[in-house]
Amino acid sequence: TRDVADVGGLILNRENLLNTAYTMDEIAGYITGIAFKLSNIKASTLKSSKLEGDLTELIELVVDEIYKLNEIIRSLNSDSAKSIELAQDTQKLEREIDIKYRKMVLKALEISTTSEMLLMKDTIEGIEEMADKCQEVSDSFILLALSL
């Protein structure tokens, strides 16, 4: 009967699950877009603007956030309280990402070539928007954990 009750909780939240799945699919789309933009930025622009290290750190933070989402999914099945705790960790990462994003946009605006500046700014914004989508997924998992 416990298995039936667990499935019942998921059925009641199927709309939330579907929206979460669509949002996760959007994250994959952001990854593709960011990779395309990064491949078109000249290496000399990255070095001269001193954004290479910052960009690496920003991407690492988002990757950490994605790993946290993976941990949340795994813990939903066994310990919903742990899922909520992990989701709070993603909120901390999101705040770090926002701070780094703002600093990087200001640095990117100093790039002298307009096309390179716009491409860099779009890349940074894409990474930040992907982090926002990760936060949306995390929030959905909190709702799901509370209902289980």
What are the residue ranges of the model-derived segments?
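Cytosolic, long alpha-helical scaffolding segments
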Residues: 1-148
